[in-house]
Amino acid sequence: MNGPTTITELTLFITIALAALTLVLPRKYLLLPYVVGACFAPADQTVMVGELDFQVLRILVLVGMLRLAIRSEIVPIRWNRFDKLLLAWFVVGSVIYVLQWRSMGAFINRSGRFVEWMCLYWVFRQSVRSWRDLRFAYVLLAVCALAMLPFVALEWATGTNPFAVLGRVVTDVREGQYRCQATFPHAIMMGLFWATLVPLFVGFARQQTQRRLLFWAAVAASTFMVMVTRSSTPVLTLAAVGVLLAAFPLRRYTSTAAWGVVALVIALHIVMNGPVWTLVARVGVISGSTGWHRYALIDAAIRHASEWMLLGTRETGSWGWGLEDITNQYILEGVRGGAVTLVLFCIILFVGARAAVRLSVRWQDKRESYLAWGVFVTIIGHCLSFIGVSYFGQIAMIWYLLLASVAFLYGQVHEAPKPVPRRAVVARTQHAY
């Protein structure tokens, strides 16, 4: 059965305006409609066309593809290992999902998702071909952070969401405190959206002199918007990225630190009375947080691994009370696409993080090096967020923007010439004379 069209007239007007901008703006400004749409257009409103549903972002993706085609702006891109891993993740996850459900509805659903994900990634891959392109995207995001700040502050002070005029946007209350969410479908999504932007806001603030004040102001605005969501996952993610940004001088020891974390987790699992993932239930910085649900979901997924390892599983409600709500991206990957999809997802995260660290260590200029470190910290921020939530809504835009940026970064690491040690240069010079 088809769902109803839920988009309001005002949201539809905004969508049409953004689509028009996507068609007419110069290529260097192509990311502008996507950034503005992600920040100011609700993601949970749809237009139904037959069996197909179109949200704002999906409409903009299709318009962006059309624009690149009709204006002959498609630039050949050499696909690297990261691109191929991402394509494999898309394809394998979609195929296994269809095999799991074995229905035309599942085929249509995954086909639509596959086209949306690949097209969004491809449009961003076409748009992010240099650090200048990425900087422009983050300038736009910083401006949007400052533009959204007064609206979120009003929601925090009054409990009335100014974006309610767009329809279907409300403000929840937890323990007597408003959980602000602006245009986002959930307060946690808004918090994580801004929390995971902070590392590169800081990175560009340290690199740029002209727009330094803009980026630092965006950091402050993002921090405020994270805190007023009254959600533990965004707050903990923000704290974690802050600690990792401060660890920049120790970037050469990242591999050692990672193995140390693995050893610590194993040691805790051995000495604790319960499994190490019970720590998830105990971590909470906001009153009323549901860490117990995250723990129960992880525990149930491990106990029921035989149900989803091969082709995923159709439902998780039988695992326990409330566990049909999969608030863990890693588990969602396994439930929808089995162990193969989950492993590919984890490999993508690992390869991207390693490429960012290598580039950060390689660069001699500290400002450039810190920028690459900011990409690494952003990836880790998402990795931590995935433990407490599965992504939906506007945050998909910055997630795929990050993936496209990492693909560009991976090319920098593996295609750029390696620096020659100074000793070798001196030896060659002496030999020449």
What does each model-identified segment do?
Residues I14-A20, F90-Y97, R135-G176, A182-F248, ...:
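Alpha-helical transmembrane segments of multi-pass inner-membrane proteins
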Residues P150-T160, T229, L245-S289, I302-E307:
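A membrane-periplasm/extracellular boundary helix in multi-pass inner-membrane enzymes
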Residues A356-V389:
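Loop-to-helix entry and N-terminal half of a specific, functionally important transmembrane alpha helix
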Residues T22, K28-M48, Q55-V115:
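N-terminal hydrophobic segments of proteins, predominantly signal-anchor/transmembrane helices
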Residues V63, V375-C383, S390-Y433:
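Transmembrane alpha-helices of multi-pass inner-membrane enzymes
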Residues L30, W79-V91, G112-V115, F124-L154:
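Interfacial loop-to-transmembrane-helix boundary motif in multi-pass membrane proteins
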Residues P162, L166, G176, V276-V340, ...:
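Long extracytoplasmic/lumenal interhelical loops at the membrane interface
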Residues H186-I188, S222-M225, S231, L311, ...:
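A conserved mid-to-late transmembrane alpha helix and its immediate loop/hinge
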